[in-house]
A protein has these predicted regions:
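N-terminal secretory signal peptides that target proteins for export/translocation
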Residues: 1-19
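Membrane engagement elements in two modes
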Residues: 45-48, 54, 84, 91, ...
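Bacterial Sec-dependent N-terminal signal peptides
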Residues: 15, 19-69, 282
Length: 282
């Protein structure tokens, strides 16, 4: 027979477990409510899978640098409409072959794919309160909650018009013992303040998806995000460099950013531990 002290311990444990279940239920309810309605065709779902490293046809060295845009896809395995935003992003990528990189930012603690606390910090930074949402080139004014390739491309084109030429960006990386060491170098073509970001993503992640399937294949899943200090008062022609370490593994990918005044100026891609040089327009 349990003593009074033991009964108290058991009762305390039961209360703790009940509170834990209640907290999980509340988080799940918040997640469900946050998943906004869409006007998409319910059958308009993406082909599951990741995004291969896109290599442009390299132009002559010394010309304008090849320009890419970035889309942050704020998503969740719990969100019934989130696969529709993924489909919209893939359609936008198809219309701008090799020009758009995507990072899937899984959010909320109920999502086992969420990188915490980074995903929550990113959602707060861009004012994300509904899912799915997308942000182009880290520009808060580009936040959308409608799964539309046309809207995504309109923001991408608007921001590209503001940078007719973009900085060149190259990556030199190595991977050992689960640690990625990446050296980023950029040659800027406009005056301004610049910064780097190193992002690690993973493709082919199998996890249940509401609105998808129990064995849904997720791509571009955010695994690490590192930001450099700001390089102030840069002049056109300056070369900037930054070396950083992050956790990574074989098969993951690097999405590197060079940002001007906080907005993406250019994007470079390569496998984790790999390297890629400056790329040029044809």
């Amino acid at each position: 027979m349990a003593t009074g002290l033991e009964r108290s311990d058991v009762e305390g444990t039961m209360v703790f477990l009940s509170m834990k279940k209640l907290l999980y239920s509340i988080l799940l309810l918040i997640a469900t409510v946050s998943c906004v309605g869409q006007k998409d065709d319910p059958e308009d779902l993406p082909t599951p899978g990741g995004e291969p490293v896109e290599e442009p046809a390299d132009g002559p060295e010394g010309g304008a640098y090849f320009r890419r845009s970035l889309v942050l896809d704020f998503t969740g395995t719990w969100c019934v409409n989130c696969p529709k935003m993924e489909a919209a992003i893939k359609e936008a990528q198809a219309q701008r072959s090799g020009r758009i990189a995507c990072v899937s930012v899984h959010c909320l603690a109920v999502d086992n794919l969420a990188l915490l606390p980074e995903s929550g910090e990113l959602a707060t930074r861009f004012g994300v309160t509904a899912y799915p949402s997308a942000v182009v080139d880290l520009d808060p004014a580009s936040l959308i909650t409608v799964s539309s390739p046309e809207l995504l491309l309109s923001h991408a084109d608007r921001l590209l018009e503001q940078r007719p030429e973009a900085a060149g960006l190259k990556i030199t990386g190595s991977l050992s013992g689960g640690v990625l060491t990446a050296s980023l170098e950029a040659e800027v073509v406009r005056d301004g303040s610049y910064s780097f970001s190193l992002i690690v993503v993973e493709d082919g992640v199998v996890a249940s998806q509401t609105g998808g399937s129990a064995d849904y294949v997720h791509g571009n899943v955010l695994r690490a995000w590192k930001d450099s200090e700001v390089f102030p008062s840069c002049k056109a022609g300056d070369t900037l460099a930054w070396t950083v370490e992050a956790k990574a593994s074989e098969g993951q990918r690097i999405v590197a950013l060079i940002c001007r005044e906080g907005i993406v100026d250019n994007v470079a891609l390569c496998p984790a531990g790999g390297s890629v040089g400056y790329q040029y327009e044809e």
